[in-house]
Amino acid sequence: MLLLLLLGSLTIVFYIWQRRTLSFWERHGVKYIRPFPVVGCTREFLTAKVPFFEQIQKFHEAPGFENEPFVGVYMTHRPALVIRDLELIKTVMIKKFQYFNNRVLQTDPHNDALGYKNLFFARSPGWRELRTKISPVFTSGKIKQMYPLMVKIGKNLQDSAERLGSGTEVQVKDLCSRFTTDLIATIAFGVEANALQDAKSEFFYHNRAIFSLTLSRGIDFAIIFMIPALASLARVKLFSRETTKFIRSSVNYVLKERERTGEKRNDLIDILLALKREAAANPGKMSKEVDLDYLVAQAAVFQTAGFETSASTMTMTLYELAKNEALQDRLRQEIVDFFGDEDHISYERIQEMPYLSQVVNETLRKYPIVGYIERECSQPAEGERFTLEPFHNMELPHGMSIYMSTVAVHRDPQYWPDPEKYDPERFNSSNRDNLNMDAYMPFGVGPRNCIGMRLGLLQSKLGLVHILRNHRFHTCDKTIKKIEWAPTSPVMASKRDIILRVEKVSGKKDFGQK
């Protein structure tokens, strides 16, 4: 009897708490999506029907909210805001950035040093200092110094395509991922991963494992995305134990070798060694923060982001060009016009290719790899606080999560006519005056945008030039007609393999051959 009474009391308390919690937006007069008990508005994501970015996209595109500047939602029991209006997005991401300089995502600071200490997850005020110290490796000058190393990997990709043989049906993401694995290993760590040559490359195995989620890893990511306040209690980790061990041992080895030999490569390892020396020269707080895991964490996020984003961009580009072979032939003609039979793809010339830029820009419009942007509201204890004016007089609570769907904005016919059509001509210089570039944000917006944007674009372009100059990609019987997104992936990734048929092209005369 006592147990039943206790259970009844707990049920009543839970009901009252849920009702109070899930009435937040109604009480504040904000239009919202009606939540379900316990799961809030995220039932599709939590039941693995859609990936997280698509859940945010569905919020943005929910019927009845077409003219609303924002949408109130519930991430399980936590109120959150999905911003739809471009001016409000600019306000949050740029003009009033001081209120939104932290990301929502968090991992366990006590048990996940590689996740918690890296630049992507770093919180204010430490993130700004860390970004300032790491950013030199991503400047145009440093990238140009690393470019010869990148070209070597590009030639390896070209050779790998040659070895496939004409008429081979290839799993495109696998090929592109091996290219980006080798490239990142070379320019970031100064090691040869040999993923293009070795089917069992250890580097490639661990890179792929980061995005291959088991049930337990899926739960970790659900907490990181949805309920970051539970990250410490649930002891969630960004990287698995096996991957953490591999990255830590690899980076530690390279750091020691570089210190022993004194070699300079103008790469990420040089930057990390400079941080280590600075910490040693300034004992105190900095020396406590800059330990081995702090250094390894920066290399880990560099490796992860560089591997997946560029590989996905290349994959989706080849998929679209295989479906639109006239566009593919036009790009190949530009490659021939710029380089002919030259062995070397020069840094300056690849930057000057207008149609290549149009193609990559259009891929990133239709497929912005992360798919959404998130920030956490940080209200000051004193002074002016952030409100939703002029749309609403509500003052956002400290710690509230804010989301923006880049996919929804990039596919909004208000900004992009016929948005489902793959059309590189949108980005033709003659059409520039017709574009609203505020509606284009594949690398994020504001001071916390993607630090590796230049490098990511360059490695995608370099890979495409090397693989398309002598090869044509066709659809085949195994090519999927419509992409369904993998519900457990933290980024935009096809649920099924994208398979294309590759043919050797020996020159201009072959361009029309099918």
Swiss-Prot record:
Cofactor: heme
Residues at which heme binds: 450
Any single GO CC term annotated in Swiss-Prot or TrEMBL for this entry: endoplasmic reticulum membrane
GO MF annotations in UniProt: heme binding; iron ion binding; monooxygenase activity; oxidoreductase activity, acting on paired donors, with incorporation or reduction of molecular oxygen
Localization of this protein: Endoplasmic reticulum membrane; Microsome membrane
Alphabetic keyword roster: Endoplasmic reticulum, Heme, Iron, Membrane, Metal-binding, Microsome, Monooxygenase, Oxidoreductase
Bilayer topology annotation: Peripheral membrane protein
Matches recorded under InterPro entries: Cyt_P450, Cyt_P450_CS, Cyt_P450_E_grp-I, Cyt_P450_sf, Insect_CytP450_Detox
First-level EC class: oxidoreductase
UniProt cross-references to SUPFAM superfamilies, sorted A to Z: Cytochrome P450
Broad class of the protein's primary localization: endoplasmic reticulum
Family per similarity comment: Belongs to the cytochrome P450 family.
Top-level taxon of the source organism: Eukaryota
Role played: May be involved in the metabolism of insect hormones and in the breakdown of synthetic insecticides.
GO BP annotations, alphabetical order: insecticide catabolic process; response to DDT
CDD domains: CYP6-like
EC number: 1.14.-.-
PROSITE patterns reported for this sequence: CYTOCHROME_P450
Name by which UniProt lists this protein: Probable cytochrome P450 6w1
